Regions:
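Catalytic pocket-lining loop regions of alpha/beta-barrel enzymes
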Residues: 1-115
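Mid-to-C-terminal alpha-helical segments outside catalytic/metal-binding sites
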Residues: 40-41, 49, 59, 90, ...
């Protein structure tokens, strides 16, 4: 799983009193990492690596169409386009178990590519995240079971 940090340029920024750079920078750093892996051709060169991106992929699901249009100029690295590469990845729900984040993600990938994750303690307990996922109204009971365990087992069958 690829987890972000606050970029060196932004570690000391105080976006609002009492908040940390992580509130904005973790999602932005995830976006930078996904774009780097895709646009430098690594996702195409190493198709057997199963990337799991934290926080529902940061802002990538929301910006995918916009980035895809920019990626049209990167045909060598992205012969099938940026969105095609995004559809190969997996995404966890740590810090993103809310309707706003998940609607964009579900427009990009199937539920089978979403795995459970938490950012405990700041993101709440596993129970908190499970409740928040259910409260979005976006998932059936079977989807919630898949996100909770089954999708991870399909990625890592030896842990079944």
């Amino acid at each position: 799983s690829v987890h972000p940090t606050a970029a060196n340029c932004c570690r000391n920024l105080e976006y609002a009193p009492g908040t940390s750079a992580s509130s904005i920078e973790y999602g932005t750093d995830t976006t930078r990492a996904i774009m780097g892996i895709a646009f430098n051709g690594d996702a195409v060169r190493f198709p057997d690596i199963r990337f799991i991106w934290s926080h529902a992929g940061g802002s990538v699901p929301f910006l995918a169409d916009r980035i895809d249009r920019a990626g049209n100029r990167a045909k060598e690295a992205l012969p099938n386009g940026f969105s095609a590469e995004l559809k190969k990845f997996y995404y966890d729900v740590a810090g993103a178990a809310n309707r706003g984040a998940l609607v964009s993600l579900l427009e990009l990938v199937e539920t089978s590519q979403i795995v459970f994750g938490t950012d405990f303690p700041p993101g709440g307990t596993s129970s908190d995240v499970a409740r928040d996922l259910a409260d979005t109204g976006l998932f059936s009971e079977s989807d919630l079971r898949a996100i909770d365990r089954e999708n991870a087992v399909s990625l890592f069958p030896r842990f079944a």
